[in-house]
Amino acid sequence: MDKFLTYFQVRGERANAVRLFGEISEQIDCSHLKRDCFVNGICARQHFKECCNIATDNGSRTNADKLVALALRALLDRQTIWTCVIKNADYVSQYADEQMEEEVNKLYDVYLQSGTREEFEGFRQRNRPSRVVMDDSCSMLSYFYIPMNQGNPAPVAKLSRWGQFGICYYDRTNVDGLIPYDEIGLAQAIDGLKDLIEGRLPVCPYTGANGRINAVLHLPLEMEVIMAVQENATQLMRRAAQDFKFITHAGWKLYPRLLRQRFAIEDATEGVIHHVMLGHLRYYDEDTSIVKYRFLNDGSLDWRTWTIPLHLMRTARLGHLQPESILVFMHKKLTCQVCFMVDLAMLDTIPVVDSKVAELTGGTDVFYTRAYVHADNHKVPNVRDLMMNEVFRKIDDHWVIQKCHTTKEAITVTAIQIQRSIRGDGQWDTPMFHQSMALLTRLIVYWLTDVTERSAIFRLTCFAIFGCKPTARGRYIDWDDLGTFLKNVLDGRDLTVLEDETCFISMMRMAMLHVQRSKAVCATVLEAPLEIQQVGQIVEVPFDFMHN
């Protein structure tokens, strides 16, 4: 194939089309209906490589142009191309692992030579490599509300801190209600609590931070045992930090978008959040609210059961779920909101609110997905299960499938998912690598892309595989801000023609190798005939078809 491309000077997107079609043409079943598939009496759709070799040997520019046009035209039918890739993957080389490692190394060379690594290392860096995988499926917002006792702040039983957050523990028997965190009449009392915690605990026992206390969380005493576990405290308090950012943006231009993203509330001011959090709900013949129920009821040993389920709250706000179901979920101490909705027969109508995708693509911000599988133990989704125009994404720890309408939308959804959950360390045979390849394979093979979109996919692939390798100074690139990440990945410079061709070859082969690994091998292609041990002359015994 390279000889054909070099001889006839086929470059850029035309070369990429020829290479991809050449890999899968043997799997195409052509009807020859229009007879435009024949080149020198051979069906070029089914025998593309052979026709390219003949055209090269004959030096036929006319046939070469016809073959290139045929490849470009064939790639417009992406569903057929995807099906052929799946069929082609049933036959696996015995050296598939070595081939994958070779392609990863080639991609790394382009990563270096194109200046992409240098570009990445020019971004903000940090010392810590660890991070918490986060999305907006659960929240600690209810614990910012202030516990009351007979019209006064409830007495505090214990004090603690985490970073710049003060933590007050309360005996539930001394709490008869909760009021908004921005109540003007209690501002002085809360400031007094901040000063008290800062004086008693000048250094955070979790993080070692010694700065000012910026906010106070109000937790029941029963949560102390959960917060005593470092991992639980980190997970919960990172979400509390996200909630505090939401609170401090009240009155800003960004706040309506945050309201829409986190609570599916549209065109509202900051006061509406208290209607959602403190609004009366009827449960077991009692009036309660999301904040009150969360504070007065225990979770399990899993930290998620102590949060409020934001995804269920958005679903209820969109009218697809009874609000009381939110309390049922918390009462049962469940952890997966998608599994809960599947049990309620919402298998393929699970809503996702994504204002970032809407902002970048100009489309709707509400998407309806179908449940795929719970992601226990780094489970890798199988790309063979995707149907037309679909991509994978996750809601908390559950894979779902979303239908996209444009290539840009598919790239954006995939980029958001990879930014949330994938941090590549340069190792290719790890669960995280296979998860990233499951997401990227669909982009590389299925969607029709131009050079700008392929450049974005290349940077996204480099991030997913190499993005968390330390720099020469031992620091790590900070990828935590989604807006900055999308700007750096989607809006970078276009690859040159040579870079585009080189990285496309490696990404295409990596994608096909991943598809091969996604299914039990049907047949292994041997590099040379395998000699069977000789056992002497075997006499063939005749069989009688009608024998009883």
UniProtKB/Swiss-Prot annotation:
InterPro entries: Orbi_NS1. Belongs to the orbivirus non-structural protein NS1 family. This is Non-structural protein NS1. The gene is Segment-5.
